Curated annotation (Swiss-Prot):
UniProt GO BP: mRNA splicing, via spliceosome; RNA splicing, via transesterification reactions
Region (Disordered): 242-272, 473-537
Cofactor note: Binds 2 divalent metal cations per subunit.
Subcellular location: Nucleus
Protein name: Lariat debranching enzyme
Name of the encoding gene: DBR1
Binding site for a divalent metal cation 1: 8, 10, 228
InterPro entries registered for this protein in UniProt: Calcineurin-like_PHP_ApaH, DBR1_C, Dbr1_N, Metallo-depent_PP-like
Compositional bias segments (type: Low complexity): 251-260
Record's keyword annotation contains Hydrolase: yes
Cofactor(s) needed: Fe(2+); Zn(2+); Mn(2+)
Gene Ontology terms, MF aspect: metal ion binding; RNA lariat debranching enzyme activity
Amino acid sequence: MKIAIEGCAHGELERIYDTIACIEKESNTKIDLLLCCGDFQSTRNLEDLQTMAVPKKYLDICTFYKYYSGECVAPVLTIFIGGNHEASNYLQELPYGGWVAPNIYYLGYAGVVNVNGVRIAGISGIYKGHDFLRGHHEFPPYTESTCRSVYHVRQLEVFRLKQLSGKIDIFLSHDWPTGIYEYGNKAQLLRKKPYFAADMESGQLGSRPLEELLKAVQPSYWFAAHLHCKFAALVPHQNATKAPTKMGDGSSSSSSSSSSESDDEESTSRLPPKPVAVTKFLALDKCLPRRAFLQVLDIPSEAIEGNPTFEYDAEWLVILQSTNHLISVKENYYYLPGKKAGAIAERFNFTPTEEELDSLTTKFQSLKIPENFQRTVPAFDPQEQSNYKHMVVGQPTAHLNPQSNTFCSVLGVDDPLCLALLANGKDLPAVADQCQDQEPIEGSSPPPEPLVTPSKRKLNLFLPAPTVTADATAAEKDDSVIDLPEEDEDPKTAETAESEAVDNPKVKAVPPPPSSPPSVKKLKRRNQNIYQAEDDD
């Protein structure tokens, strides 16, 4: 199966798909799958755009809305993870993954799927140590703080991915694992990015949780982005503890596999040593001319005619189900179970057992991922909103997606967004239905099931009745526009600064008409920085 890997998409879907079409034409081959390593920017409209954590002068609607509205259709199955420049409100509606547009699938906070038998895992976001131990407490409309923390990696997703057994063919992340540069051409990397040297020396370049995942999961391929350069590495694994297992055979216990290895150690002592398992790591650039942003690989897969088979991963579904009680939506730190739990007899190994895998068949008769995408909000209108960069638009309120509602209902897990809203005394909105101003999409799902709310036992909260009035809610909505300061999420680079050195044109204040009375009170402008002669960013 031919798979195209994209670094940072930055909303340039048309250019990416055009590049794939050129490759197919020149090589006379068909690309079966596109994987994107973050900064996808699935902005459906101007409200989504306000939740993206970038300074206002860099906000760009790009082209995703065309695929969301149905004006364009993705020519190849596309799977992506989130980065640090996303329509966070939309992705937060799909914590366990789902379709953001026809033929475009988001993996969720973390996820595992199978395409033609190729097992693909991924984790969204970037690592920031001060948020890693927190729960998923954010919900829209965001504050200046939560607009950024919402895409920071949390310990729960890393913990869940560590429970996987068997072979992982491909792993996707936005960040690089810490220390990955030691396994490639470090000198060449520093010639391209000399400002990486300080972070390398301090151990700050990359994500430490991803380094742990790399050692635990040991995938055949690991693809990343974020640092806007191409870099390859070969990572050997001396201790291959992950025993390959078939989905559903139940032989996934790490303890049993380790004991069997020790039993066979003496009998195989005279045999030649086994080849050391190696992970092939590749980071790619962002979608710009003359940049290495796309790579095509040919990976062995099941021979299937027609469209690729796209399925849930049985082991991952069981892990989600068995760790549902570990979800936290609190802002304070909390800790997950581990081996050193003292006298508390709490389960810490959630690698699925044979019985747990067998019980999954009662809930999922088929692992095929349903094509149940629905448009739930109006898409951007380029004719009516052509001057959008000078418009004042507020953030949207929280929405519940019918895909997540159905998934949570069938699997018996909680939607973290629902929990966060309830924990903060908010009323749950109704599950979004098919957008009324657009035609239904062929193959879309039937009307969503009734909203599944978390049980009182799960929440373990005693919440007062909401005290926010309608007037207060309206006032809050007026203040939902936030002006984000610059934040160094990425290492500063000369080429990045050059590519982003674009300022908004000045906006002149229009004087009142002559008939206006001279005594009109002058009001203070909201978002005054938009009207300044010079930008501070």
